[in-house]
Curated annotation (Swiss-Prot):
EC number: 2.4.2.18
Binding-site residues, 5-phospho-alpha-D-ribose 1-diphosphate: 72, 75-76, 80, 82-85, 99-107, 111
Positions bound to anthranilate 2: 157
One Gene Ontology term of the molecular function aspect: anthranilate phosphoribosyltransferase activity
Keywords, sorted A to Z: Amino-acid biosynthesis, Aromatic amino acid biosynthesis, Glycosyltransferase, Magnesium, Metal-binding, Transferase, Tryptophan biosynthesis
Signal peptide extent: none
Ranges annotated as spanning the membrane: none
Lineage: Archaea, Methanobacteriati, Methanobacteriota, Thermococci, Thermococcales
The keyword Ribosomal protein is annotated on this UniProt entry: no
CC per GO annotation: cytosol
Catalytic activity, as annotated: N-(5-phospho-beta-D-ribosyl)anthranilate + diphosphate = 5-phospho-alpha-D-ribose 1-diphosphate + anthranilate
Gene giving rise to this polypeptide: trpD
Entry's cofactor comment: Binds 2 magnesium ions per monomer.
Name assigned to this protein: Anthranilate phosphoribosyltransferase
Residue sites binding Mg(2+) 1 per the record: 84, 216
Source species of the chain: Pyrococcus abyssi (strain GE5 / Orsay)
Amino acid sequence: MLEKIINRENLSFEEAYNLFKELMNESDVRIAAYLAAFQTKGYTAEEIAGLAKAMRDYAIKLELGEVADTAGTGGDGSSSINVSTASALILSAFTKVAKHGNVSITSKSGSANVLEALGLNIKIPPEKARKMIEKTNFTFIFAPMYHPALKRIMPVRRELKVKTVFNILGPLANPAEPKFQVLGVNSPDLVEKMAEALSFLGVERALVVHGMGLDEVNPRGETIVAEVNGEDIDMYTLTPEDFGVERVKVVPCNSPQESAERIKAVLRGEGKVEDRNFILINASAALYASKVAEDFREGVELVKGILGEPMSKKLEEIICTSRS
């Protein structure tokens, strides 16, 4: 199949699925060649879905019922705080969340990095994950623990130090198979493709977002959105005004520790207005995608109502349960 990809021929869903199986047994050189060739060719929605389905099927099984997830492809170069992780924590005050993530590959702080900086034990095995989500509505699925099939591929990906198809696949490969999802992408070209891939994978409702260079809902301007409802996909744009929130700039973040402190400040009902508004609109999008909120303005009001003591206690409960 390598020659086919080099010749810029697209793969079917089944071919992409089988390609993942092949990669598990290939040499480092051929894995690197596949990743580079795929990156040069670009990917179709069908290819993305086929690879993601294979990743899910070869992952350690995790049956948690209907859950939500918030994730981004990363690689947008913004060095922003971990907004999708903050949104997942807030969302868990309303519904079950299985946050799938990893340490940083292309940014300063991945979801695993910031959760560890917050004090969580990120290495949660399946049985504990089930108990944790029952008790707290939240669990973290640390990708390296749940995707043993990637052991051959990940060292090559790290050595390449460039974006690959696995930046895109990570947010789709949650072994808990979330029914509800917000998925941020680092390129406008990926919005519709990823929405189609999520539809292929059977999501109930999802929002795929790109905010003028950000793989988040943009607090300073427009965000392109693909809303997935089963097989239906609607494209539209959002601005902070649609949330009833004032526009703010994105303040860069230098480390997981800084991101954790700034997130904690917002959860306490404090923090900079830039961080607060950024988290408000993204958490609202997560509430809407999960069918908790009827619209984005209601989502913001629900989030505002939980910030402060309720979210501080919620975070402490999640941390303590992860470590017990």
